Amino acid sequence: MDKMTISEFYDQLLSDKEFQEPETGNLFFPAYIYQYDSQDEYNIRTQIVNLKDRLIRPNNFIDTLILNIYDEFISFLKDEKMGDESILGLITQNDNEKEMPDTIKDVLFNKANSLEFFNYINTKANTHFKEPSELKKVYLMLYGFGSIFPFLRASTYLKNFEEHVKGYKLIVFFPGYYENNNYHLFGEFHDENIYRATLINP
């Protein structure tokens, strides 16, 4: 059986007036995962933008916050230092090398999994959801977990971000599939089960 398409996701869930209320759905952890074939990455990204356009139309009036977790990590690194050097600058210097030095890999892993980075995303989300607007604000959509791998996994992000998800619904787009109680990034790499998040399209 084919999995739910993005268009069906909109028709069956996102445009549903009851689901558009932050207090409905999974009340304990209002986080949802949409799985897709990683080969469809750029098509999915285009469709995510289309979702935002459809949700802001008069029949919904919803202003959706969409974030690329990889792009947000790069922005976060702009102000981060490794000694006297900008971490982002060090990465740029090593762009032409076949293999990134282990010291930089370790720093990137630690930064991506840091409380500071999770707070950085939370601050951006709070700014959006608390800013006065005539539009409803219900959804935070996150994608880019294929790009930020191996430094941050979707399961790690969700476990650490759970305490921040209040007053809105978090939707994570996952480039892989769910099978045997576990998520598989790119259909290959094991990612832990995120028990408290709801899989939208099993």
Residue ranges and their predicted role:
Residues 65-115:
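Long, charge-dense
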Residues 149-202:
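Glycine-rich, aromatic-bearing surface loops/beta-hairpins
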Residues 17, 116-133:
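A short, acidic, amphipathic alpha-helical segment used as a generic capping/interface helix at domain edges
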